[in-house]
A protein has these predicted regions:
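Bacterial N-terminal signal peptides that target proteins for export
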Residues: 3-20
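C-terminal motif of bacterial Sec signal peptides marking the signal peptidase cleavage site
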Residues: 28-31
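Conserved functional acidic sites
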Residues: 33-233
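Residue-level preference for beta-strand/loop junctions
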Residues: 20-21, 193
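Generic detector of intrinsically disordered, low-complexity segments in short proteins
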Residues: 1-4, 232
Length: 233
């Protein structure tokens, strides 16, 4: 009798252990299946549209400051067109698109080629090579946790960027955009320098606004400028 009870208890323990084992395996398999069906997060790469043939036109205000120049605050107004054109291999063997910049002084003038740069989305980086400087204009995903050094591939000083006003509707110069994002490129003001830089992008379009102000000043006074540049699209 005792032997029977002992054997019964032993077999019961084996059954319990086996049941626990099966349960654990089922949980693992369910977890793997659940993870495999998880929807990948949206990266929002359409903010940086590299579709061939796409173009955007801007009206630009550019001010160059130099207290030693004959024109100390040289102000230029012109029109700028950015067009994505045919593909080209870069020095890393990557397929880029030509990023062609056209300019004209007056609205009725013909467009003239000013610069030919290149543009690419490589992994999670949106890059433009301008004046032989490879700059990371955006990084994906577009969210509050993403930040990056735009000049990481250059010898220039670090330019730390992050996103603000994410997926906000906005109207600029009478044009309405359903979803925009601001790329903050830094701002500061001290005794001898003031700068504020940002770009704004619209989904399915690209850059719709640029604000660049970098001035060498005196005694915190942003009107007492010795040198610097302002650029507004």
């Amino acid at each position: 009798m005792n032997k029977f009870v002992y054997l019964f208890m032993f077999n019961l323990n084996e059954i319990r252990n086996f049941s626990i084992f099966i349960t654990l395996i089922s949980m693992i398999l369910f977890s793997c299946k659940k993870n495999s069906n998880t929807v990948k997060p949206e990266l929002h790469k359409s903010y940086f549209d590299v579709t061939q043939g796409r173009f955007i036109e801007y009206e630009v205000l550019e001010i160059n400051h130099d207290e030693n120049a004959s024109i100390q605050h040289d102000t230029l107004r012109y029109f700028l067109k950015i067009q994505i054109e045919d593909t080209i291999l870069d020095n890393l063997g990557r397929i880029n698109n030509k990023y062609v910049r056209y300019k004209k002084s007056n609205l009725n003038d013909p467009w003239m080629i000013s610069d030919i740069w290149t543009i690419i989305i490589d992994g999670n980086n949106a890059e433009i090579v301008e004046e032989n400087q490879r700059t990371v204009k955006m990084k994906f995903p577009v969210d509050t946790y993403t930040n990056w050094n735009a000049t990481i591939f250059t010898n220039l000083s670090s330019l730390d960027c992050f996103y603000e006003d994410i997926h906000k509707a906005r109207t600029i110069n009478g044009l309405s955009f359903d979803s925009t994002v601001k790329v903050n490129q830094g701002s500061d003001r001290n005794l001898i320098r003031f700068y504020n830089k940002f770009e704004r992008y619209a989904k399915g379009i690209g850059m719709i606004e640029k604000y660049y102000k970098d001035l060498n000043i005196s005694n915190f006074d942003t009107l007492n400028i010795s040198s610097g540049k302002e650029l507004y699209f």
